[in-house]
Amino acid sequence: MSSESPIRIGPAKNEGDLMQVLAIQEVVFIEEQGMSMELESEILDREAFHVLAYNQGHAVGTGRLLVLSEPPPGEQGRWGQVARMAVLRSSRGAGIGKALLETLSNEARKLGLNGLSLHAQASTQSFYEKEGFVVSSEVFYEAGVPHVEMRRGF
């Protein structure tokens, strides 16, 4: 029996991959959470680095990294923003979110970024804290959902 994980993370390289990213985001953010969002324009943002998580060949999670034009207030250097982290309900709890975040963090380091920021839903704050992110804002609302800004330097 192989101990190799059936989970694979890789960049979204083509239109088919980007459509899988969009499908996962629609399920998680719109169907599950009831958000009304304009995902398509974001998915077509070619400046973003999108990743997909596959479990036994099926796309089950996604996230993206954007390089910010300026660092967050109070920070120095070049920073990135992690956004649209989503894992299908049937695949949660298997370490996929952590693997996605690690892949995005590694890409940020390759790009020479000094840190990452993100807007975490209040319900996911503890996940990001376990990954070294620190809350850097009061609670605010995006798409009707409470969020906090979080940051992690490298």
Task: Label the predicted regions.
Residues 1-15:
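Conserved N-terminal entry element of GNAT/NAT acetyltransferase domains
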Residues 23-37:
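Helix-loop element at the rim of GNAT/NAT acetyltransferase active sites that forms part
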Residues 41-45:
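Short loop/turn motifs at secondary-structure junctions and domain boundaries
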Residues 52, 58-70, 81-86:
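Conserved beta-strand in the GNAT
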Residues 68-82, 92, 142-144:
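A conserved beta-turn-beta hairpin within the catalytic core of GNAT-like acetyltransferases
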Residues 87, 93-106:
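Conserved acetyl-CoA-binding loop-helix of GNAT-fold acetyltransferases
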Residues 101, 108-121:
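Conserved GNAT acetyl-CoA-binding A-motif
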Residues 117-119, 129, 134-151:
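Conserved catalytic-core motifs of GNAT/GCN5-like acyltransferases
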